[in-house]
Regions:
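Short loop->beta transition adjacent to catalytic acidic/histidine clusters or analogous donor-positioning motifs
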Residues: 6-10, 32-43, 65-68
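Conserved nucleotide-sugar donor-binding catalytic segment
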Residues: 11-14, 151-233
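Short, well-formed alpha-helical segments that are part of the catalytic scaffolds
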Residues: 18-33
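A conserved acidic beta->alpha catalytic loop
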Residues: 45-55, 98
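Glycine-rich, basic loop-to-helix element that forms the pyrophosphate-binding segment
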Residues: 72-89, 110
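Short aromatic/hydrophobic "clamp" motif used to bind/position activated sugar donors
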Residues: 94
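The conserved acidic donor/metal-binding loop of glycosyltransferases
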Residues: 98-102, 127
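Conserved donor NDP-sugar-binding/catalytic core segment of glycosyltransferases
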Residues: 106-144
Length: 276
C-alpha cells in the first residue's frame, strides 16, 4: 500500500458575509481534529466579511498556521470563489467542505487511502449524514439532529448512469486529484449547479468517479438553504446543466427534457407547500 502523505492534501472552504461564525468555527475545529490532517486549509472569503467572522478566522490562523485565507474584494458567488481557490492549490489532492459542515475525524484518512490505492479514480465522494440544524442548535447533539444518511451509487459505471438524472457525488464530501479537476475546467458558473456541472465535465473527459459508502461528513440542512434552491428561479440553471449533459454525450435531448420536468417539479413547489 502506498505511504499516506497528508502533505499532499489541501482542504478547500468558501465563506461569505452571511456565513455563520459559530458554524465556521465548528467546521475548522473538525478539520484540526482529523486523525490524518491535511497539510493546509485554504479558506476563500467571498467578498467583505463582518468583523466577528473575521475574528473567528484570525483566531484559527493564530493557532493553526496551516490555515491560509484569500480575500476576494467583491462577492462573486461560490463558483468563482472555488475556482479562485482551485487555482491557488499546490497539493496533489484537495478536499471540499462547506463552511457549515462537520467532518468526522477519519474522513481525510479514509479518502486519501482510497485514492492512493485507486490511481484511476479522479474524485471520491462519500455518503453524508444530513442533520437538522434547528435541532442541533437546541441540543448540540449531532446524533439527535440526524435526519437521514444520503448515499449515492458507489462504482464509476453507476455514477455515470446516475449523472444522467442527478448529481452523482455529494460535493461537500469530495476529495479529488487537483490536476484532473483543473483539466476538466474546474468550477464554472452554474447557479446552485456547480458541483453537478463539475462531475459532468469530469465524465466528459473520461475521468472516473467513486463514492465511499461510509458517511464521513455531517451536512446541515437549513430552511433558508432549501428556499434558495426552490421556486421558478431554479429552472434556468436546471436547463443549463441538462444542455451540458447533452453536449457531453451523457444524456439525450428527450431524456434531458424528461429530467427537467421530473427533477424540477419538486424544486418549483413553494416552500410553504412542501412543509405541509
Amino acid at each position: 500500500m502506498p505511504t499516506i502523505k497528508p502533505k499532499n492534501i489541501t482542504a478547500l472552504i468558501s465563506a461569505y458575509s452571511r456565513s455563520d461564525l459559530n458554524e465556521l468555527d465548528e467546521t475548522l475545529n473538525s478539520l484540526w481534529g482529523q486523525n490524518l490532517a491535511a497539510e493546509s486549509v485554504l479558506l476563500i472569503t467571498d467578498g467583505p466579511t463582518p468583523n466577528k467572522l473575521n475574528q473567528v478566522i484570525s483566531y484559527h490562523q493564530l493557532h493553526h498556521p496551516k490555515l491560509t485565507t484569500i480575500q476576494l474584494e467583491e462577492n462573486q458567488g461560490i463558483d468563482p470563489a472555488l475556482q479562485q481557490g482551485l487555482a491557488e492549490i499546490n497539493n496533489e489532492f484537495f478536499a471540499r467542505i462547506n463552511s457549515d459542515d462537520i467532518t468526522l475525524p477519519h474522513r481525510v484518512e479514509h479518502q486519501i487511502i482510497f485514492l492512493q490505492n485507486h490511481s484511476d479514480i479522479a474524485a471520491a465522494g462519500t455518503a453524508v449524514i444530513e442533520s437538522d440544524d434547528h435541532i442541533y442548535q437546541k441540543t448540540k447533539n449531532l446524533n439527535l439532529a440526524t435526519t437521514k444518511i444520503r448515499s449515492l451509487p458507489e462504482k464509476d459505471d453507476d455514477t455515470v448512469r446516475y449523472c444522467r438524472i442527478n448529481s452523482p457525488l455529494n460535493h461537500p464530501s469530495m476529495m479529488a486529484r487537483t490536476a484532473i479537476i483543473r483539466q476538466s475546467g474546474g468550477y464554472r458558473q452554474l447557479h446552485f449547479m456547480e458541483d453537478y456541472g463539475l462531475w459532468a465535465q469530469l465524465i466528459s473527459i473520461g475521468a472516473r468517479l467513486h463514492n465511499l459508502p461510509e458517511p464521513l461528513t455531517y451536512f446541515r440542512t437549513l430552511t433558508a438553504q432549501i428556499q434558495r434552491r426552490t421556486g421558478v428561479g431554479i429552472l434556468k440553471p436546471k436547463w443549463q446543466i441538462q444542455q451540458n449533459l447533452i453536449s457531453y454525450g451523457i444524456t439525450s435531448k428527450p431524456q434531458a427534457i424528461f429530467n427537467l420536468i421530473v427533477r424540477t417539479f419538486y424544486r418549483t413547489i413553494p416552500r410553504p407547500t412542501l412543509k405541509k
